[in-house]
Amino acid sequence: MIEILITIILLAIVLGMDALSLAMGMGLRGVAKDYEKKFVLTVGILHVLMPLLGLNLGLVAGRFLGVWATRLGALVLVYLGWQMLSKGYAEIQPQRYNFAEAKTILAGKQQSTLDSWTSILLLGLSVSIDALTVGFTLGTLKMPILITVLIMGLIAASMSWVGFAGGRVLGRLTGSYAQILGGVVLLALAIKFVV
């Protein structure tokens, strides 16, 4: 029983690595605490639901959904990564603002393209799709499925939270260069998803 539990925890950690990396990249960019909470909750729920869905869908449907969902997630990451690179590069260049623009920027009221539930769901799916394929093997474990997927969800959510916290700390240390670093991380993740 202990060996099976250790196996499930290790599997959950591996499945949560994409969420950790993505959250760290977004943490470098700097996102609102409300967004972090929504993302962590979404990733946790998806890491519970996706294995259950995979268990019920079967291998053929899982392959079809896995390929397209991963590609869509990769496109979202390319867009966000490119946006972060552009913004980071622009921030290290000297800029002039009128009073209204400076006030908005200093107040942190610039709109983020990450704020919508649609983007949260797409990004959550992009890092949870591996859990769908893991669902096909859940029946072979000698552990109750509900406990297994709850462990996966809890660990993935925790790893997302750690990623945001780590990204925030690195962002404070590196300043505007964190935007560029975050963009590179997201582009690398997009390439990993496609390959």
UniProtKB/Swiss-Prot annotation:
Membrane topology label: Multi-pass membrane protein
GO molecular function terms listed in the Swiss-Prot or TrEMBL record: manganese ion transmembrane transporter activity
GO cellular component: plasma membrane
Protein name listed in UniProt: Putative manganese efflux pump MntP
Species this protein is from: Syntrophomonas wolfei subsp. wolfei (strain DSM 2245B / Goettingen)
Compartments it resides in: Cell membrane
Stretches that traverse the bilayer: 4-24, 39-59, 64-84, 120-140, 145-165, 175-195
Predominant location category: membrane
Keywords: Cell membrane, Ion transport, Manganese, Membrane, Transmembrane, Transmembrane helix, Transport
InterPro entries noted in UniProt: Mntp/YtaF, Put_MntP
Protein purpose: Probably functions as a manganese efflux pump.
Family to which this protein belongs: Belongs to the MntP (TC 9.B.29) family.
